[in-house]
Amino acid sequence: MKASRFFIGTLKEAPADAEIVSHKLMVRAGMIRRVAGGIYNYLPVGLRSIRKVEAIVREEMNRAGAIELLMPAVQPAELWQESGRWEQYGPELLRFKDRKDNDFVIGPTHEEVVTDIARNQIKSYRQMPVNFYQIQTKFRDEIRPRFGVMRGREFIMKDAYSFDKDTAGLNESYRKMYDAYVRIFTRLGLEFRAVAADSGSIGGNFSHEFHVIADTGEDAIAYCPTSDFAANIEAAEALPLIAARAAPAEAMEKVATPGKAKCEAVAELLAIPLERTIKSIVLATENEGAEPTIWLIMLRGDHDLNEIKVSKLPGLKNHRFATEQEIVDWFGTPPGYLGPVGTKKPVKVIADRTVANMSDFVVGANEVDYHIAGVNWGRDLPEPEVADVRDVKKGDPSPDGKGTIDICRGIEVGHVFQLGTKYSEAMGATFLDESGKPQPMLMGCYGVGVTRILGAAIEQNFDDRGIIWPESIAPFEVVLCPMGYDRSDMVREAADKLYAELAAAGIDVILDDRGERPGVMFADWELIGVPHRLVIGERGLKEGKIEYQGRRDAEATLLPADEAAATVTEKIRAALAH
């Protein structure tokens, strides 16, 4: 490829709406241009990287035995109504009517369509296992699209769906996809972690997320540096304390805490550790034809509520936060001074595991400007219902018993689920087993965010000059920068020869023959992030040398001109040999 015949749309400044590094650099490097909120054109530089991601994904999916197909982006509402997700999915599902007033959606995922394929095409256990996949454009109507391709509305995704006759088969399909994802993200050259996760709106029994580690990641990941444990903070278990609860040492006492509605302020006023205060969170669940059930969730003052865990508790699947009026009606006081002692109406109390182990703690007195100190279970309050309802935090014991938890940030780029029979039962996708009896198919689904990978890779690989691509997904692997290509026969001949040698070796090379000044050339290719650069100039050629600099290198080095192609080829192949 010669740069004069390619489109290079670099910019000096990032758009005002770009908040994170990847968004700024993708625009400045000429990879994307905004069409509407969360919708982008992928310009030639960006498309080259997308195609490389797709190629790696496709190779590993095929290697794992998955079979590629292509399903429509537009899906009839009837399929979504069958699965129940027409009502469940919410406003992120883009719905529309055709000219005949039929309801359709633009697919954010394809569970319904692929289940429809399976129920019509798979009749016997002999036809399984089978795993279908596609690489296709999706649409989710995000309420606030931002961060460029990281949270867009339209995006490219690889989604795969496995069908098995039994749990053993599903487990094997899941393992193959998990292993394929490890190979994919390793080949992409990314630092990543596979973490245990919640299945979310997709549903199902068992799932893992694959996160690229980056400080700007939206997701918090709990991991153990001394073991393989890693989990999304929503799914990481906070273990119960091993030590027995201490015996009461204080009498229960009402204390004045004027204007101190936060645990931190109460702890400071009373000169006690924050860990001795209780954070009271009030939830409500609806009862048809009757007043709601009010729940008091008790957390230690330095802990945070985990709503995912709460939603899995009996009776709390469809919980909401109580209104201020409900809080006043049940507790007799507005938020800030709430507690389990002396409520106006009965409430259901759930104590986090840590709270259940506390003694002589401080709670709200259900009276403005007052708290109660020295509260103890069994003596002042009945023993509570106990559950894990908090986020883990740094320093907590690891659930695998092999160290303590640390927290990092991650960008989700892949997700694998065991769906079980969620969709097959809802949509009647059955097969005849060995005895001729109909059974529901067991499903798994497996997604990779192709376009999101680009943003995540940049968040992990950049400097003040621009992107630093891993070789596997760089738009070009090496750029040739000739000094005076249009003025010097020596330079032009050497550059053309080097270009031909690299191309013959299968290297993805671009020759910058635009006639730009060296500073402009270097700035463009550093911004775009090409991993290897060779500079060809008359002075160096007279000495038999060509200048080489890797994108991560602080300084350039000189290579023998007749060895430059082989040296760079070896560097690239070594980088790709994961």
UniProtKB/Swiss-Prot annotation:
SUPFAM superfamilies: Class II aaRS ABD-related, Class II aaRS and biotin synthetases, YbaK/ProRS associated domain. GO terms for biological process: prolyl-tRNA aminoacylation. One of its GO terms (cellular component) is cytosol. It catalyses: tRNA(Pro) + L-proline + ATP = L-prolyl-tRNA(Pro) + AMP + diphosphate. Keywords: Aminoacyl-tRNA synthetase, ATP-binding, Cytoplasm, Ligase, Nucleotide-binding, Protein biosynthesis. InterPro entries: aa-tRNA-synt_IIb, aa-tRNA-synth_II, aa-tRNA-synth_II/BPL/LPL, Anticodon-bd, Anticodon-bd_dom_sf, Pro-tRNA-ligase_IIa, Pro-tRNA-synth_IIa_bac-type, Pro-tRNA-Synthase_IIa_type1. One of its GO terms (molecular function) is ATP binding. It holds the Pfam family tRNA-synt_2b. It is found in: Cytoplasm. The keyword rRNA-binding does not apply. PROSITE patterns: AA_TRNA_LIGASE_II. Consists of three domains: the N-terminal catalytic domain, the editing domain and the C-terminal anticodon-binding domain. Catalyzes the attachment of proline to tRNA(Pro) in a two-step reaction: proline is first activated by ATP to form Pro-AMP and then transferred to the acceptor end of tRNA(Pro). As ProRS can inadvertently accommodate and process non-cognate amino acids such as alanine and cysteine, to avoid such errors it has two additional distinct editing activities against alanine. One activity is designated as 'pretransfer' editing and involves the tRNA(Pro)-independent hydrolysis of activated Ala-AMP. Belongs to the class-II aminoacyl-tRNA synthetase family. ProS type 1 subfamily. Homodimer. This is Proline--tRNA ligase. It comes from Burkholderia ambifaria (strain MC40-6).
